[in-house]
Structures are given as C-alpha cells and as structure tokens.
Amino acid sequence: MSGATLTYVLVTPARNEESFIEATIRSVVAQTVRPERWVIVSDGSTDGTDEIVRRYTRQFSWIELLRMPEHRDRQFAAKANCFAAGYERLKSLDFDLVGNLDADITFGPDYYEFLLGKFSERPKLGVTGTPFVEDATQPDSHSYAHGAANLTHVSGACQIFRRKCFADVGGYVAIKGGAIDWIAVTTARMKGWETRTFVEKVCFHHRKIGTGNHSPLMARFHYGRKAYYVGGHPLWETLRGFFQIKESPLLLGGLYFIGGYWWACLTRMHRPVSRELMAFHRAEQMARLRNLWRRPQKSRDAGVAVPSGKGV
C-alpha cells in the first residue's frame, strides 16, 4: 500500500493566530496529498484569525472554521477541548489518520505524503511526526539533532495518529496544566503502539515554544514543573537539567529547569497521570539512562566520539 492510498484529516486549535495562521494554511493547501477535511477551531479569537480562515474556506470546501465561545483563560485544557470539538465534526467521515496541527507551523509540500508513507510501511505505527525548527536559518538545529535524542517521542506541534491508535488512547485528555500531547503519545506506547519521530524532514515552528506567556527562563522553570507533573524520575530529570546548561539561556536555563522540577516536588504539585502511566514513563527513562551509560564505554572502546547530552 502506498502512502497516497491512506487518507487523513486535520484539526487545528487556534487562538489569536493572525500573525501565523495564513502561512500554515498555505502550507497545507500546497500539499501533494491534501487532507480529506480540515477543521480549524477558533478558540474565541479576538484578532483577525477568523477572517483569514474564512477567506480560505470560501476557496477550499474541505477547510472548515468552527468558532468556540470567547474566553480569557488561556490554558491547555482549552486546547484539548477545542481539538475534541473539531474532531467531533470529522468522526462520521471515512479516514485512516488524524493530525493535530498547531496554527503557527509550516512545512514543505510533500510533508504529509512523507508521513503517510511511514504509516503504510509500519502497520504498528500509531503516532508520528518530525522535529520542529524554530530558526529557519538553521534547519538542522533541533532537539533531535544529536545522538542521545529520544526518537520515540513525537512533538505536539504537528502530530498525526492512526485512527485506531487515537481511539485506543482516548484522544487528548483535557488537563489544565498541559502535557496533553505527551500523555497521548506515551499512552500509545504503553498500549503497544509504535511512536516515532522521523528526522528526514522538519516543520517550522514560528512562535518560540513555551514562551507564549513566559520569559525564556520562566518557560524553562515551567518545563521543570511539567516534568514532575507527568511523573518524571528525579534522577533522570536532574541529569536532564544539567545537560541543558549548555543551551540558551546559557547555564541558567538548565538550572531553572531543575529548580522547577524540585519546586514542584517539594510543594507536592498535583500529578494528573495514572500510576500505571507514571511507572511506564519512569521505566522508559531508566532504560534510556542505562543505554546512555553503556554507550560512552562502547564508544571509548571503539575510539568513537560520544555525543553531547543536549536536549536529552
């Protein structure tokens, strides 16, 4: 079966994205394999987002605008609820795959054809995607561009699920504190699906991730809190913070990440994940740590340079 024989639909939650969404729409319109339907869910946008989308709905019958009521609270549960509302409009259709596409993403014209091909090649592939790049002048600079990258994780900005897998994980769980995409992908692995990021292609993320409401340093602090929130192992997350010391913001970014994790631990921040998922997550982290521990010894024995810990 070729990738072109598979069909897909897209849902895009969007809130005040007038600066980016037109480029996203143009990227999808230019695809060599277009979606069967695309529902763009405006989450109470108060800028020009809706009018931009309406212009394209008049040109392309497979694009639909769904407007949610206006509200002031910007949080991740709202994004999950928007996705669910958009997906409800699609469930009666016949399709194989469903994609979650952020409203500030662009990519090349064969992006989805490439991903559809991966699903055709791998019957157990449940979720896939590619790295995202935040600086278009450095397309090879992303969090998967090193030897220690976790290719089983799929970033939430542009995920695509096999329909059966999406049903198995229960869709995106509406959790106010975030990590809805991480929970979906990790649950998929726990239920026996393969999840994979393919680095042969990238997409471009035009708003720096994690900085919508925070400075870069506070974004790192909140990432640390989130690492605790989803049940990350203390040893792994502390080492992860030290590995991030070399990243921008230099030194402080990694320390803020560690501080966020341990602040959440000391204040006993509520964790929304099940004990089963937390245990699975920690077991995966410890398995990766053992593999990383063995790799330097094997590399030294073979006289091979060991990759840095950036982005672990």
Please annotate each region the language model reported.
Residues M1-A30:
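N-proximal low-complexity "stem/linker" segments adjacent to membrane-targeting elements
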Residues T7-V9, R37, I183:
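Cell-envelope/extracellular polymer assembly enzymes that use nucleotide-activated donors
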Residues R26-R72:
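Acidic donor-binding segment of Leloir-type glycosyltransferases
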Residues G86, D94-T106:
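Short beta-strand-to-loop acidic/aromatic patch adjacent to the donor-nucleotide binding site
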Residues L93, T106-A145:
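Conserved donor NDP-sugar-binding/catalytic core segment of glycosyltransferases
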Residues S155-G170:
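Conserved nucleotide-sugar donor-binding
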Residues C165-V169, I175-H206:
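A short, conserved alpha-helix in the catalytic core of glycosyltransferases
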Residues A219-V312:
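Non-catalytic, C-terminal membrane-associated alpha-helical segments of glycosyltransferases
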